[in-house]
Amino acid sequence: MQNSVNKFFIYLFFFILLINCSLSKKETSNQNEDIKIIFQKLKPIEKELNPNLNIQLQKLTKGKPFLRNNTNNSGNINFETNFDNLSSFKFKKIDQFEFNQPELLFTDSNSIIFFDGKGAIFNINEELNVNWKVNHYTKKERKLNPILYFAQNGKNLIVADNISKFYSLNLNNGDMIWSNSNQSPFNSNIKIYKNRFLAIDFDNVIRCFSLEDGSEIWNFKTEDSFIKSQKKLSLALKGEIVYFINNLGDVTSLNINDGSLIWQTPTQSNVIYQNAFSLENSDLVFANNSIYFSNNKNEIFSIDSKSGIVKWKQTVNSSLRPTIIENLIFSISEEGYVFVLDDKTGNILKITNALRNIKDKKNKIKPTGFVIAKNKIYLSLNNGRLIKIDVLTGLQENIYKIHGSKISRPYVLNGNMYLIKDNAIIKSN
C-alpha cells in the first residue's frame, strides 16, 4: 500500500512538472511574439529608379577645386579626358594602401606632394619630375610604414601621420622647420586657418596647433570607442567654424578661435556605438549652408550648419565623399549605384547602375571615389578600372583599365587628371 502511494505522488510530481514546462514554453513563445524590432537594418538599394530622367547641370566650378578647398566640395569641374595619354611616377609601395585613403596635395606653385611606403616625402612637378625628396623618419619609424596627411601654409608644408608625429617642412627644399609629437596617431585630413592648423587623432580628439612652432592652442575631446576604425576622419571649415565627424558618427561644430562648442549632433544609435569599428563615414561636405555626408550603414544626411538640426536622412549606402552641384547631390553606393538627390528635400530623383557592364564578378567590385567634370562622372574602382558616365543620361561612355588593383579617387589640376595606386601616381591629360 505504501509503495502504491509513493508511486502515485511520484507520477503526480512529474505530471505537474511537465505541465509547468509546457506553460513556460508557451509563455516564452508569447513573449517572443510581443518583441518589437526597434533597430532594423535597411537593405541597400540595388534597383534603378527613373533611369530615363535627364539630369541637367548648368554651371561649371570656377577656380581650382582641389587647391585649398576647405569645404571638400569639388562641384562640376571644367575638365575632360579620354585617357589617351597616360604617364606615371613610381615610388616604394604603400603596403596598407588598400585600407587607407591617402591624398595628393596640390600646391600654389602647381607642384604635387605625396609620400611612399617608407615615409619619404616627394615634391614633383606637373610633368612628374622630382623637385625634391626627403625622409625625416628613423629606420625604426620607417618599418611602421607611416601614412601621411598634408596641408600647405604659404612656403611651408604641414605634415601629420598615423604614428603620432607632426611637423613643418620648407616647401622649397623639404628641410625640417620644427617637429612635434602627439599623444595619439592622427587619422584625418589637415585644415589651415590663419596662424593655426587642425587635425583629428585616433582618440576622437580634434586638436588645434600653432603653425609657427607646433604648440597646441586648444583641443576638444569627443566620445571615444575601444576599437578604432581605419577609415579616415574628416573636417571642413567655413568662416571661423570647423565641422568634424568622429568614428562614432557624431558631427560637431566648434569655434576655431577658442575651440568652444557650437553644437553636436549624434547620428548613430547605441547599437552602432558598440560596433564603431565597422562604421565608415564619408568626408563631410559643406554647401548651401548644410553639412552633407553618408555612411556604410545605408544613410545619407543633410545637417543645418548653423543649428546642427538634421534636415533630412535618406537611404544611400556609401562611405564615398558626395558632390553637391547647384541643388543636386550626387553619391555612389558601395554596390555601384549612382544616386541623384534633391538638396532641399532629400528625395531620390534618379538611380542608375554604374557597374552594369562590368564582367569581372570573381571579386567584389567596389567604387573607391569619384569626381564630376563637364557633366561626366569619373568613377574609380577597387579593381583598377575607371568608368566614365554621362550625367545627363546616366549611361556609361567608357571603361578604362588603369591598374590591376585599387586606384584612388581622381584629382584634377590644370587640365590633368591624377590617380594614385599603391606604388605610383598616374597622370592623364
Please place each PLM-identified region on the residue numbering:
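Blade/loop signatures of beta-propeller domains
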Residues: 31-88
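Loop/turn-rich, solvent-exposed surfaces of beta-rich toroidal or solenoidal domains
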Residues: 324-325, 331-340, 347, 351-389
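WD40 beta-propeller blade core
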Residues: 122, 167, 207, 216, ...
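Structural signature of WD-repeat beta-propellers
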Residues: 116-117, 125, 161-162, 201-202, ...
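Short loop/turn segments that connect beta-strands within beta-propeller blades
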Residues: 125-129, 170-174, 210-214, 255-259, ...
